[in-house]
Amino acid sequence: MAYEIQEAKELVVKAGKELIEKGLIARTWGNVSARISDTQFVITPSGRAYEDLTPDEIVVVNIDDCSYEGDIKPSSEKGVHAAAYRHHPTVDFVIHTHQKAATIVSITGMTVTNVYDEFRGVLGDTVPCAKYAMSTTEPLRKNVEECIIENPSARAIMLMHHGALVMGDDYDHAFALAENLEACCDKVIKDNYLRHSWEKTYSDDAKRAYFLDKNGAGKMPESICDLGSSVRCSNTFTLTVGDKTLDVGTDNGVGVNGIAPKVEKIHRAIYNATGCTMIKHVTTPDVVAVSCTGEKMRPMIDDFAQIVGLDVKNEPWINGDTDECAKAIAKAAKGRNAVLIEGNGALVFGNTEGDIQALEIIMDKGCAAVVDCDIFNRPHYVPKAECFLMRTVYLAKYSKQIDE
């Protein structure tokens, strides 16, 4: 049964906060909707952070043509939600997420068949994957609708290179679908590693070791150089390395209140090359593992192409020759928001704390995708033309909108 409009709006706001708490979405990614009649639903607005949403900002949309009421623009994926309501009359709550494990499995393009018994009661027998099309586009809506029509019993579907769509009878059912889908896909990833490696038990460390050995990239480093984090203000930046913090001039690299460490050259070079105001060293295990390969990254996920760049270079850490190292890293940073440092993780850079948080999440998810899809032997990449379009649109519009 459809919700009353005010209850629907309040539940959509509540869902956004709960999805963040459960780690199924972040920042403004994904979207949530609730049916209010046979002809209308309410949905989250475009480009607004879930933490600050109010019921007054939730938009009423017509199922038939996706026209909407008011001055607030609805989510650009409203057509995907409309398709779910159109083809499933009993569905009253829809969530589109960019959840990690489901997104990684979506990259393979394969349907999850014979869903594990422990998840089958919620997910059904299969979880199909909609064919790829660029996010927010009419081709994506058509591909998702085609997948829904061809799999009428599926209430959870994956969107290739993108994320997942769950279609619940109500709020609780939608969340059960999203959580069971993530747990199911996580198990698919782990079981795939066990099949390929012939190991009897799973561990994250063993999986990364298998990935590195498979790619002739040695072993995970026993220690990682602290490349520091910093925040720029005008012609100086505050650099933190370990437990030490000092101010450094962006023009001359001179420490204002102490002797600047060698890594200041790298930070200064990135600031001068990109114009960013924040830099952070990311050393999550999957990011370190991918940095050990010495190979650049290409986008496997739409979010990565939009927010990080068309690729991410992997530059060697030349200990003791930091002028050359800083120059190479600065060159690799241009036009991007991250650079891998061989054997030492990555540096991400942006203009707000929100940018840095998003970049950390996406680099970690993107590197996990590199590891897992390599083991699947299905490293499918987002087409270059779509990467270019998404990156251009994001830089021009979306990144400005979320900071307003």
Specify the residue positions occupied by each region the protein language model found.
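Glycine-rich flexible loops
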Residues: 1-404
